[in-house]
A protein has these predicted regions:
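Conserved positions within compact, well-structured domain cores
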Residues: 1-128
Length: 128
């Protein structure tokens, strides 16, 4: 299934939240994609931010919002449509053991990629 050209998985979560199958800037579920500071919209190849955060277009200075405005939302800027960065509540729903079973995988699909695999207790769909 796709929205605005990007694939997603429906884990059957109570909220109806659909999760993208890969990270922003990634071409597959096993690709790291880009890294963003909170509220940043310019992706970086490394998770390490050296120097001045201004150079990374970090827009917050002490006024951290629980939900980003769309002009500060990397997912919305890069993927468009209704895509947005997950909220705290969406992460909590994903992590809730009533909804999913999660396992840390060290060599996913024999691609030397580690990460967490979520399997829905509702419809058995998976998200890596």
């Amino acid at each position: 299934m796709k929205h605005n050209g990007f694939e997603y998985v429906d884990l059957g979560l109570p909220s109806g939240t659909k999760w993208a199958t890969c990270n922003i800037g990634a071409i597959s579920e096993t690709d790291n994609g880009l890294y963003f500071p909170f509220g940043g919209t310019v992706g970086l190849d490394s998770p390490h931010y050296e120097g001045n955060f201004d150079s990374h277009k970090l827009k917050f200075n002490g006024d951290i919002k629980a939900t980003l405005h769309l002009d500060n939302d990397a997912a919305h800027i890069h993927m468009g449509g209704k895509w947005h960065m997950p909220t705290k509540e969406q992460f909590e729903e994903l992590l809730d053991e009533k909804n999913t079973v999660s396992t840390w995988i060290y060599d996913y699909c024999i691609r030397e990629v580690s990460g967490r695999l979520f399997r829905s207790r509702i419809n058995n769909e998976t998200l890596f």
